Swiss-Prot record:
This is Ureidoglycolate lyase. It comes from Rhizobium etli (strain CIAT 652). Pfam families: Ureidogly_lyase (PF04115). It comes from the Bacteria. One of its GO terms (molecular function) is ureidoglycolate lyase activity. Keywords: Lyase, Purine metabolism. PANTHER family: UREIDOGLYCOLATE HYDROLASE, UREIDOGLYCOLATE LYASE. Its cofactor is Ni(2+). Catalyzes the catabolism of the allantoin degradation intermediate (S)-ureidoglycolate, generating urea and glyoxylate. Involved in the utilization of allantoin as nitrogen source. One of its GO terms (biological process) is purine nucleobase catabolic process.
């Protein structure tokens, strides 16, 4: 019998063990450019460890997932953080796990609104990008440079995500 994962709304508090939620937070807002622009300052910090490492900006186009979806693997980046911010304004799923002795624990699933992004801290277990409904573009900030910045883990028995409510 498969083990089903519940989908919860993405909130700063619930996501705090894994990184930051990137959204327009009034507490971080300041006016700039003569009062014509609201700047939501320092919502997350990019990490790029190792000699020759640098922070880069990418555009990812995620293809929609089919449901029910089997979460059979997780990945993490030991040398850098990775952030995903939707450019298409569509919701997406965020799947993360706490580390349990060098392997991912039971995954947690969050539904991000189309105006929310996430920043996975360095070394946080997460599932690759999970677009919903249709192909969606994401601005991705992560690390480039020497060294293997990808570790993958495959579960013996996948966890299952039911289709998110519309």
């Amino acid at each position: 019998m498969p083990e089903f994962l519940d989908i919860r709304p993405l909130t700063r508090l619930a996501f705090a063990p894994f990184g930051e939620v990137i959204e327009a937070d009034p507490a971080s807002m300041r006016l700039i450019n003569g009062g014509t622009t609201e700047r939501f300052h320092a919502l997350a910090a990019a990490e790029a460890a190792g000699e020759g490492a640098r922070v880069i900006i990418n555009l990812f186009r995620g293809q929609p997932r089919s449901f029910p979806y089997a979460v059979d693997m997780m990945e993490r980046h030991p040398f850098g953080s990775q952030s995903f911010s939707p450019v298409s304004g569509r919701p997406f799923l965020v799947v993360v796990s706490e580390d349990e002795g060098g392997r991912p624990g039971r995954p947690q699933v969050f539904l991000a609104r189309g105006d929310q992004g996430v920043n996975y801290r360095r070394n946080v277990w997460h599932h690759p990008l999970m677009a919903l409904g249709q192909a969606s573009d994401f601005l991705v900030v992560d690390r480039d440079g020497p060294g293997n910045n990808l570790e993958e883990f495959f579960f013996e028995t996948p966890f299952v995500i039911k289709e998110p409510a519309s």
